[in-house]
């Protein structure tokens, strides 16, 4: 038997991926180094918005996503990286959210 509880991120991804469908609108409210954003993107949501107030965090997230083959998702707008506080979410997203992580 595989132990899925190796770390909190792995455990959270295991649970969250059950709720993300190809029609889901998903938010990573604090993208940081991009690892959670990457996991969410790999679940295949319709849209993924990743917020951070630090430009370096957004740049690091972009670099990670590109290195993992998600350039097209970024270019198409399926994944949107936003350098702003998640408290300003209403300025960027008008549709209901299906999943949000902090």
Residue ranges and their predicted role:
Residues 1-25, 29, 35-42, 59-99:
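S-adenosyl-L-methionine
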Residues 17, 40-42, 53-70:
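Glycine-rich phosphate-binding loop of nucleotide-binding enzymes
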Residues 23, 45, 96-97:
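A general structural motif
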Residues 25, 46-47, 78:
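Residues at the starts of beta-strands that form the adenosine-phosphate
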Residues 27, 49, 82:
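Conserved Rossmann-like nucleotide-binding pocket used by diverse enzymes
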Residues 29-31, 97-102:
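Conserved proline-anchored active-site loop of SAM-dependent methyltransferases
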Residues 47-53:
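Conserved SAM-binding motif I beta-strand of class I
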């Amino acid at each position: 038997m595989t132990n899925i509880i190796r770390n909190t991120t792995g455990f959270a991804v295991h649970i969250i991926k059950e709720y993300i469908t190809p029609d889901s609108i998903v938010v990573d409210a604090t993208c940081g180094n991009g690892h959670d954003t990457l996991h969410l993107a790999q679940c295949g949501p319709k849209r993924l918005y990743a917020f951070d107030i630090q430009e370096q965090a957004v740049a690091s997230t972009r670099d990670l996503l590109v290195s993992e083959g998600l350039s097209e998702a970024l270019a198409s707008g399926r994944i949107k990286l936003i350098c702003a506080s998640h408290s300003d979410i209403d300025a960027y997203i008008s549709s209901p959210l299906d999943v949000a992580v902090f």
